[in-house]
Swiss-Prot record:
Gene3D superfamilies: YVTN repeat-like/Quinoprotein amine dehydrogenase. One of its GO terms (cellular component) is nucleus. WD repeats lie at residues 87-126, 195-235, 248-288, 296-335, 393-433. This is Uncharacterized WD repeat-containing protein C343.17c. It comes from Schizosaccharomyces pombe (strain 972 / ATCC 24843). The keyword Magnesium does not apply. The keyword ATP-binding does not apply. Residues 41-78, 547-576 are annotated as: Disordered. It holds the Pfam family WD40. One of its GO terms (biological process) is double-strand break repair via homologous recombination. Coiled coil: none annotated.
Amino acid sequence: MDGTNNTIPLQFGKQAQTYDINALIARFIRPKESFLINSVEKESESKLNSKSTTLQSSDSEDWDSEENEDDITDVGVPGSHEIMFPGHSKIVTTTTFDKNGSRFYTGSLDNTIHCWDLNGLSATNPHPFKIIDPTDTNADNVGRYPVSKLSCSTKNQILALYTHSQPILYDRDGSLIVRFSKGDQYIRNMYNTKGHIAEITDGCWQPDSSQIFLTTGYDSTARIWDVNRTKSQLEVFVHVPEGSHTGLSRIPVTSCAWNPAKPDNFATAVLDGSIQFWQKGSRTKRPVMKIKDAHLPQQGISCLSFSQDGNYLLSRGEDNALRVWDLRNSNKCVNERIDILTPKAGGNAIFSPTQKLILAGSTAVNSMKAPLFVLDAMTLDTKATLFFDSKSTVTASVSAVSWNEKINQVSLGSADGNAYVLFSPNESIRGVKDAAMRPPKSKHIDDDLSSTVHINSLSGSAGTSDFGLVEETTESASAYFLEARRRRNAVRKDPKLSRQPQVGRLLEENSVDDIPLATMLNEDPREALLKYADVAKSNPMFTKMYSETQPTPIYQGVTEGDISSEEGNPSKKQKR
């Protein structure tokens, strides 16, 4: 009877298919080689629990997925599982989530922004629902500019900063909202300009605001903008180097950050190695505080980040230095690390939502794996290191990192053009976790490309192999046929590849000779008259009598005197 019950359904209708959620999530677990937990942390925990041999045998073959998740989760980072987002052809310089964590955006040096919908994402084969490329809509007036920074407001407006002088605002669907104005590059006084006159380097939204944002640029200014005022900025703050006059010399402002505890205060980093603090609405337009020689001059400070209480500032420079500053006593940094290499593009560092950790990506050294360092926020000691394999010959590096507190997921950008989102099944909610728990879609029989015949291939269309069989590929059937259709359309435009024959005559052209007077516009009247000249001479119809009475025509003779007298007498001239 047990065998009969297994084969015969106990109810009518279509049976719902059940899936093992743990098995679905296990597909995206990170291997144990991609983690390196600090040994000091392990030894201290093993002494507290002498009965547990988990940490002492972490390198053994009995290491399973649950232990993997426990190790990295105990550190405080939801990084036991990952989903990779491919698509960019160059370094991913910036990544960001929207406020609710339902949308994910990546920007790259390939000049494009990829928009990902995490609610409808296929975890095994993710594709962006939109790719923003400004040259697609305005190729004549817009050049090729890499994306330097993306930032989402509380109303999910995307602030996109390219390596030109105009900030751009998109909505959450990737549609253009507004392009802000640029300044007059021939005006030397930056206070009189209405926008940046040089490349923008960094920008961010004011905390808990969807109307005010800040940008910095190579024109030695920091500018505050209002989304409702697109023709000019609200305020301009000009960095004046010591020993120079206003407008005579310019030094780039490389990064900026708002103070969450004091929303009207912000900090800027300058190429001379200093960090300056400003106040919005100040009449003097001068910094209220300055940290000189925070980093080496002419190296650039790639990142500034405040703690939530506003007492600590994190700075990272291209001199491979990572420093934490106590703003209550800024004469000397609290701690620093100079052994973490800064990537050439991107290279930011952030505080965790608990303010206890710092995440900083770095460049691989003597290996093909890019490291992400998890540091203690105060001591800057390494608590864990996460490694990511490089899928290309480019030097592996983690170039961008962001953390969404609401869904508790971490996004990364790498030098090989891929982006990653880290999550934990127990600690994370929604986002890519829902995509990982979603079962794969049932495939149609035609999705098996090895047994599918492309109908258009019978006529020798492009994109197919011999005998009408579809080429072997790892793409889905719909994606393959879409690409094949694009190739066929491109081939049709080439007369040689498409083997176009010479165009024949139309039906009207064949019957035009039968229509009287159909070709009068194309005839020469002089040529038509001369055609009858010989006939008129041999057989004249109207002057035949003159051939007998006057065979030789006799014309009246005209002398020069008659011509001159006729010219002198205006009465003899014919009136027109």
